[in-house]
Amino acid sequence: MAASTSELPSTVATVAAATVENLRFSGTDYIVFTLMLSASAGIGVYFGFFSKSKNTTEEYLQGGKKMPTWPVAISLVSSQLSGVAMMSIPAESYTFGFNIVFTVMAMIPTVPVLIYIIVPVFYENNVSNCYEYLEMRFNKLTRQLVTITFIMNQFLMLPVYMFVPSLAFSQVTGINIHLINTVVSSVCVFYTMLGGIKAVVWTDVVQGGVMLLSVVLVAILGTSHTGGLSKVLENASEGGRLDFNFGIDPRLRVTFWSGIFSGLLMWTGKVGLDQSCVQRIVSLPSYTHAKKSLLIAGIGFLFIMIFTCFIGIIMFSYYYGCDPIQAGLVSKPDKLMPFFIQDIMGHLIGMPGVFISCVFSASLSSLSASLNSFAGVVYFDYIKPHIRHTDARANGIMKLVIIVMGAYCILGGYMVQNFNSIIQTMWTITGINTGAVVGVFLLGMFVPRCSAKVAVTGIIFSVVAMLWIIINAQINFKAGLIRYDVLPNGLDQCEARDFQVILNSINGNTTTPAPTMEAPPQVTTAFGSNRDFSLYDISFYWYKVLGAILVFAWAVPMSYVWPTDKEEKQNPKLYSPFVRNMLNVPDPVVEMEEMPLKSSDLKAKENGTSQDA
């Protein structure tokens, strides 16, 4: 291990020797946290009871399509920075190194993809629901199939969003995790249900400010306590945390290539093709506002997320040679962040409360946006076709859907507590269908000859194939054929006497195993493999990319088996601007820069009939 880390003002040992009370919230911390929740609830009450806006469905879901640029941009950033990001990404950097930053850097190519390829299609077709585009381009079955995958993802992921910050709160307060989860989820459901999209966006602005303040303060204070930036980089380099991996083996846990390509697919899917974000993008007055908002959001996202990734490096450098996980003071990496905060900031009045507010702000912003869009999708795709629609009835039903889903999130916490690696679990779950969803949208925009039958079967083929691959990968994990051992740290630099006594006691009761002549096991690790190549061994970072590739691998040849009807007139506005010159129809003359989205009522009048008939 490296040289002495005498610069550390405190060590794991001093924390271990501290009383339980020293690792708990102070009264000031509780006040800070309560103020954050109260501000969020207050915004919901304002837009629910005192705002002068019309009580229409369009107002509830899209803010009357008059939302301002900067708040929407901040809201887009906030909703991408879930509590999982705040807790698990630093843990990922701490245990596996800084390569996770490549997934963050993928936002750089994602923004122009959204601005010039995807969002123009939505605005030119006056789409208020991104899944509406699939019905226009293919058929209603394609739309319903993709909305089912959206609903499945929400059921799987929403409990995770709230459980992770509850874990952090429990770590520093000792309060039961499920009690915290119940209280905070209820607050989120309350303001989302009352205030609609305006409450979601403006609470995201408040919560985004809390997140920015917290992340910057943690990075600055952590660097200062470690001995400066040069010491952070020195320790991280010696510990292998700054060894960037450019290998092309897809079995490696995360590399430059898997980070960039999977990140590009993930951010394109989450920001540009997921209704929770598209709903806010199309709530802006025009395409020009949407471009500005996406550009601002991209810059803000990169700033906060790079800081978040680097906090993991700071934590490693701070605990270099004195790992609290190995010492048994932290049960798993996902709990390390709040422990670190208490260690370096516990003596600063209110600062632990600010950080926990940051983690909850991140989760609340993700949960509120998802609940609002989930209610809209469920109502318009599955309830509205079967009832007599009125704005009052629609708003009432959507509020009820939000309440039911909030209750499910609370109960889902009992399942999430059994997950080992939160970030790996999330990437694995979303890997089942995210690639298929992104793939079918890109098919619609880039492959004019692709028919509805090809699109539907392509989605099914991709999802079934990915499910098969992921199930077999989990079997390999259980069998020990895939094992993601973390990068090494140690306990040899712990200098405090109390901790050394514990360490000596452990060593005194440990025997050295007899040497064995057995060959090393055939296993795939995070950093290499001595097994024959198997598709089941590929890193979970590649799942989204593989899912999209499978859609195209099926759709391109099958588009010659089931071609589009030659008599069917192709609408060039349904395709990306980059492929319209391939069509045998003139390019539409559209002044898009200042073109607002039409309201649903206006579209209904133009069509002469309701689409849900």
Residue ranges of model-derived segments:
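Membrane-embedded helix-loop-helix hairpins and adjacent transmembrane boundary segments
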Residues: 1-613
